C-alpha cells in the first residue's frame, strides 16, 4: 500500500514507476466498483476548487463526476471566475483557497503557475493541464493501454505522431520513460521537442529500460508500434500564420489507415486525447475546410471511426484516473 496522502500531482516526473502503477491499479479498482455499484466514498465532506483558465470538457467533467461519486463538493472557477494572475498573484490565490478547500485543481497556462499554487496552498494541488504538461491525461492513456493489450507497459511500443513540441509530446515522453516503454516522437525537424526534456527523459530511460527515439521518418518511427497517438496540430488563439505553416509541415504526418498498416501490427491501436479535427462537423472543422481545403486534420475520419480507434475508452478513463488521483492524495484510506 502506498501512502500518497497530501502529495501534489503536478507532473509524472515526481512519481516512481511503482507509484504510477499504484494510481493505475487504484483507477482500475474504482472503475470496477463504479460499474458494480460497490464504490466506497473516501472524499466525504471534502471541498475541492477547480480553477479553469482554459476551457475544458473531459477534464472538468472527470473532476466533477469523480468528486461527486466520492462524496466531495466542488466549486468551479472558470476563465472569468477568479482573479489569478490578474488582480491577485498565484501565491495569494493559493493561500486563500488553501484556507477554504481540501484540494485544488488547476488547468491553465505556465507550469510555474501550478507549481506556485502547490508551494503556497498547503493542500494537494492537481495539474489539469498546462502549456508544458498534461499528467492526468497520461494516466488515462496508460490505463486504456493496459485494458487493450495483454502485456505490461514496459513491453509497449508507442509512437506520438505530429506536433513534437506540444504538451502531449512532453507528457507522454515523461510517462513512457518512467514505465520503461519504447517511445518514439515522429515529427518534422522544424518542430523540435524540448531538448532539455529529451535529455532528462533519456537519463531516466537508462534506469528503467525505456527507449526514446525522435525522428522525422514516419516509416521508421511507427514500425512495430502497438499504439499510434496524435493531438491537434494548432491551438485555439494561435495566429493564422502559425496555422498555415504548421498545417503545411504536419499534413504528411496525418495518422490514417495507411500509417496503421505501416506499423506491421494487426493489433495496433489509435489514441487521441480529444477533441479531434477529423471531419467538418464543427465550427473549427468548417473553418479549416474553407481556409485550407482540408476535410480532416491530424487523423483521418476513417481511422477515427475504425476498430483501431480506442479514443472513447480513453476519454472515459479520464474520470476513473482523475478520481484515483483525488482519492490517493486526499481520501480517507
Curated annotation (Swiss-Prot):
EC numbers, comma separated: 2.1.3.3
Reactions listed under catalytic activity: carbamoyl phosphate + L-ornithine = L-citrulline + phosphate + H(+)
Enzyme class per UniProt: transferase
Binding site for L-ornithine: 167, 231, 235-236
Record Pfam families: OTCace (PF00185), OTCace_N (PF02729)
InterPro entries linked to this entry: Asp/Orn_carbamoyltranf_P-bd, Asp/Orn_carbamoylTrfase, Asp/Orn_carbamoylTrfase_sf, Asp_carbamoyltransf_Asp/Orn-bd, Orn/put_carbamltrans, OTCase_ArgI
GO molecular function annotation: amino acid binding; ornithine carbamoyltransferase activity
PROSITE patterns membership: CARBAMOYLTRANSFERASE
GO BP field: arginine biosynthetic process via ornithine; arginine catabolic process to ornithine; citrulline biosynthetic process
Subcellular location: Cytoplasm
UniProt pathway: Amino-acid degradation; L-arginine degradation via ADI pathway; carbamoyl phosphate from L-arginine: step 2/2
GO CC terms of this entry: cytoplasm
Binding site for carbamoyl phosphate: 56-59, 107, 134-137, 273-274, 318
First-listed, main subcellular location of the protein, grouped into a coarse class: cytoplasm
Purpose: Reversibly catalyzes the transfer of the carbamoyl group from carbamoyl phosphate (CP) to the N(epsilon) atom of ornithine (ORN) to produce L-citrulline.
Name this protein carries in UniProt: Ornithine carbamoyltransferase
Amino acid at each position: 500500500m502506498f501512502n500518497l496522502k497530501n502529495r501534489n500531482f503536478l507532473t509524472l516526473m515526481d512519481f516512481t514507476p511503482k507509484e504510477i502503477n499504484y494510481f493505475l491499479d487504484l483507477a482500475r479498482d474504482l472503475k470496477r466498483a463504479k460499474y458494480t455499484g460497490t464504490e466506497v466514498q473516501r472524499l466525504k465532506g471534502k471541498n475541492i476548487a477547480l480553477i479553469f483558465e482554459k476551457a475544458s470538457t473531459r477534464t472538468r467533467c472527470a473532476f466533477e463526476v469523480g468528486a461527486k461519486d466520492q462524496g466531495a463538493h466542488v466549486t468551479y472557477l472558470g476563465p472569468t471566475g477568479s482573479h489569478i494572475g490578474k488582480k491577485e498573484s498565484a501565491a495569494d490565490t493559493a493561500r486563500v483557497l488553501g484556507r477554504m478547500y481540501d484540494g485544488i485543481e488547476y488547468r491553465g497556462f505556465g507550469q510555474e503557475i501550478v507549481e506556485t499554487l502547490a508551494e503556497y496552498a498547503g493542500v494537494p494541488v492537481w495539474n489539469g493541464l498546462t502549456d508544458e504538461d498534461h499528467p492526468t491525461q497520461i494516466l488515462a492513456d496508460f490505463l486504456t493501454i493496459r485494458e487493450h493489450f495483454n502485456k505490461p507497459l514496459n513491453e509497449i511500443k508507442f509512437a506520438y505522431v505530429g506536433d513534437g513540441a506540444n504538451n502531449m509530446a512532453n507528457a507522454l515522453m515523461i510517462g513512457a520513460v518512467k514505465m520503461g516503454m519504447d517511445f518514439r516522437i515522429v515529427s518534422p525537424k522544424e518542430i523540435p521537442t524540448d531538448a532539455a526534456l529529451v535529455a532528462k527523459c533519456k537519463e531516466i530511460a537508462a534506469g528503467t529500460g525505456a527507449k526514446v527515439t525522435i525522428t522525422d521518418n514516419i516509416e521508421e518511427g511507427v514500425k512495430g508500434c502497438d499504439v499510434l497517438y496524435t493531438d491537434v496540430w494548432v491551438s485555439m488563439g494561435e495566429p493564422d500564420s502559425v496555422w498555415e505553416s504548421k498545417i503545411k509541415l504536419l499534413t504528411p504526418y496525418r495518422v490514417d489507415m495507411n500509417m496503421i498498416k505501416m506499423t506491421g501490427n494487426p493489433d495496433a491501436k489509435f489514441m487521441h486525447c480529444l477533441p479531434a479535427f477529423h471531419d467538418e462537423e464543427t465550427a473549427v472543422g468548417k473553418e479549416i475546410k474553407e481556409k485550407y481545403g482540408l476535410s480532416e486534420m491530424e487523423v483521418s475520419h476513417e481511422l477515427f471511426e475504425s476498430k483501431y480507434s480506442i479514443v472513447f475508452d480513453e476519454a472515459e478513463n479520464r474520470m476513473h484516473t482523475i478520481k484515483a488521483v483525488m482519492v490517493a492524495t486526499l481520501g480517507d484510506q
